[in-house]
């Protein structure tokens, strides 16, 4: 009985430690993004998840996207 209790206690400690380590990694990544995050000015390229484009959001205005006819790709700019 005592061995089973110790075994369960050790497993719980390992699980809690791994969950805590993942949270710390996520915190470091999000703080890095905050430092490097910037917004796009008027007429600069921007990102729009609906169109599958990556990039910063717009400082002012909206991210307007259009499909380039011959290439079939989306191009987004701040307006």
From Swiss-Prot:
GO molecular function terms attached to this record: calcium channel regulator activity; toxin activity
Signal peptide: 1-21
Cell compartments where the protein resides: Secreted
Tissue and organ distribution: Expressed by the venom duct.
Cellular component terms per the entry's GO annotation: extracellular region; host cell presynaptic membrane
Residues excised as propeptide: 22-38
Record keywords, A-Z: Calcium channel impairing toxin, Disulfide bond, Ion channel impairing toxin, Knottin, Neurotoxin, Presynaptic neurotoxin, Secreted, Signal, Toxin, Voltage-gated calcium channel impairing toxin
Cysteines engaged in disulfide bonds, as pairs: 39-59, 46-63, 58-78, 65-76
Domain of life: Eukaryota
Summary of the function given for this chain in its UniProt record: Insect-specific toxin that probably acts as an inhibitor of presynaptic insect calcium channels, presumably Cav2 subtype. In vivo, induces immediate paralysis on insects, followed by death when high doses are injected.
Domain comment quoted from the record: Adopts an inhibitor cystine knot (ICK) fold. Is defined as a knottin (one disulfide bond crosses the macrocycle formed by two other disulfide bonds). The presence of a 'disulfide through disulfide knot' structurally defines this protein as a knottin.
Comment field (misc): Negative results: does not affect frog neuromuscular junctions and glutamatergic and GABAergic transmission in rat brains.
The name this protein goes by in its record: Omega-phylotoxin-To1a
